[in-house]
Regions:
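Phosphate/pyrophosphate-binding active-site segments
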Residues: 2, 136, 159, 171-172, ...
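Glycine-rich, anion-gripping cofactor-binding loops and their flanking helix/strand elements
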Residues: 63, 211-294, 397-428, 440-444
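Active-site diphosphate/adenylate-binding microenvironment
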Residues: 7-10, 15, 25-28, 34-40, ...
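Conformationally flexible catalytic loops at phosphate/diphosphate-handling active centers
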Residues: 116, 138, 144, 148-201, ...
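Glycine-rich, acidic loop regions that bind phosphate or pyrophosphate groups
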Residues: 100-140, 237-339
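Thiamine diphosphate
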Residues: 99, 107-114, 300-310, 314-320, ...
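A short, small-residue-rich loop immediately preceding and capping a beta-strand
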Residues: 20-23, 44-46, 64-103, 208-209, ...
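Glycine-rich phosphate/diphosphate-binding loops that line cofactor/substrate pockets in enzymes
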Residues: 9-19, 60-66, 90, 148-152, ...
């Protein structure tokens, strides 16, 4: 039997970690890795036209599946093109491993052709970034990178010189296993009791809920019912919060509704759950503010807190609900809902087809897309005006998903995220809401869709401008 090479061990380790696909663009320095993948039936190489597409696509797959996904780039400019997509993955907290090929190991530090230092370049957009310089480091360094990406929910980068990938591997037993993390952290009983007392004594409560409420829809609705509290949702929380929610009053912030802003600014107590909503100017100045988040480092970093609890949304609310009294005052809720009704009516009136217009205006297109899409469709929207139309006119139902560069705010994310979504979910309908500026940045990857024969529906909103910044 032929002796395994380092690249073979890399591929074996990825498969053991449950990886299904590697998104990337081939290059000489990646030949060892791609040659090792080629005969495999349990790992697919997904070719793209630009490495940034590979990173965005991997991030989308990781977000939808909650499983580790991999992208790869050749040495120097090749893997450097990954960086913008990796920033998005890291800030969105999805588990992605990047394989960054490196120049020949004996040339590192000599100013060689295409020389860069990935272990420095990717340090700010990763939890783990290391160079494998000799076969003895495999698979241990790769395993640590995988475990870190999964456990800390973010990016790991492993740099691998092309010549090292082709060397004979040193036989080593795998050390680590890769169970997906499912934290169920709950605050202490005395913290829950103190929070319940504050809420029971409060009037005019508003809930601001974000993506951290995923999987806790029933508990969140029950909480709002107990407190008679309107729910303002953050953009990333839309898909988890908005549907089947009689307490929802829309978003606040730059893309938000007047009703969401009203509910926030007119509350006496603001309860933030699973959100890192970034815009300080949209927080009330004189309300009591409470924040629940699984990540303790996020408590109080957007606005001054009176109470902060570290906990998983679902188990924390399950512990809290039995201790709450029914709030008998629904005046704040009713007023906020009336504001929402009026705001929603105004937005819906903008989404009607007008005979006086030439062509279809974007609000009408977005609403029509929502009406025609399948009940489990996956939408990927570009930043700028497509995100506005998505946030206001796409109807979520608990089955649909919404992808976008909502934290990093990068142009051109919709098309590559749709590629990753369709590869991961081949039986789901995937639709982009692309801006003409965004789609043009990575236009070459329309060829990727054609090559892969993926049925992504690419909808381009053309306004002949970068309208959100002009």
């Amino acid at each position: 039997m032929a002796k395994k090479r380092v690249a073979d061990v890399l591929v074996d380790t990825l498969v053991a970690a449950g990886v299904k696909r590697v998104y990337g663009l081939v290059g000489d320095s990646l030949n060892g890795v791609t040659d090792s993948i080629r005969p495999r039936k349990d790992l697919q190489w997904v070719p793209v036209r630009h490495e940034e597409t590979a990173a965005f696509a991997a991030g989308a797959e990781a977000q939808l599946t909650e499983q580790l996904t991999v992208c790869a780039g050749s040495c120097g400019p090749g893997n450097l093109h990954l960086i913008n997509g990796l920033y998005d993955c890291h800030r969105s907290r999805v588990p992605v491993l990047a394989i960054a090929a490196q120049i020949p190991s004996e040339e590192i530090g000599s100013g060689y052709f295409q020389e860069t230092h990935p272990e420095h370049l990717f340090a700010q957009c990763s939890h783990y970034c290391e160079l494998i310089s000799q076969p003895e480091q495999m698979p241990r360094i790769l395993e640590i990178g995988i475990q870190t990406a999964i456990a800390r929910r973010g990016v790991s980068v492993v740099a691998l010189p092309g010549d090292v990938a082709l060397r004979n591997a040193v036989e080593q037993e795998p050390r680590l296993h890769f169970p997906p993390p499912k934290p169920t952290v709950c605050p202490a009983d005395d913290e829950i009791a103190a929070l319940a007392k504050v809420l029971n004594d409060s009037e005019k409560i508003t809930i601001l809920a974000g993506a951290g409420c995923a999987g806790a829809h029933a508990e969140l609705i029950a909480l709002a019912g107990k407190l008679n509290a309107p729910i303002v949702h953050a953009l990333r929380g839309k898909e988890f919060i908005e549907y089947d929610n009689p307490f929802d009053v829309g978003m606040t912030g730059l893309l938000g509704f007047s009703s969401g802003y009203f509910a926030m600014m007119n509350c006496n107590t603001l309860l933030m759950i699973g959100t890192d909503f970034p815009y300080q100017q949209f927080f009330p100045k004189h309300a009591t503010v409470i924040q629940i988040d699984i990540r303790g480092e996020q408590l109080g970093r957007r606005t001054k807190l009176d109470y902060g609890l570290v906990g998983d949304t679902r188990v924390t609310l399950q512990a809290l609900l039995p201790k709450l009294k029914q709030n008998g005052d629904d005046a704040h809720l009713k007023t906020s809902l009336e504001h929402y009704r009026k705001a929603r009516k105004g937005l819906d009136e903008l989404a009607t087809e007008g005979s006086e217009r030439k062509g279809s205006h974007p609000q009408f297109v977005a609403r029509t897309m929502s009406e025609l899409a399948r009940e489990d469709a996956i939408f990927a929207c570009d930043v700028g005006t497509p995100t506005i139309w998505a946030s206001r006119y796409l109807k979520m139902n608990g089955k649909r998903r919404l992808l976008g560069s909502f934290v990093h705010g990068s142009m051109a994310s919709a098309l590559p995220q749709a590629i990753g979504a369709q590869m991961a979910m081949p039986n789901r309908q995937v639709i982009t809401m692309s801006g003409d500026g965004g789609v043009s940045m990575l236009l070459g990857d329309l060829l990727t869709l054609h090559q892969l024969e993926q049925p992504v529906k690419v909808v381009v909103f053309r306004n002949d401008s970068l309208s959100f910044v002009e």
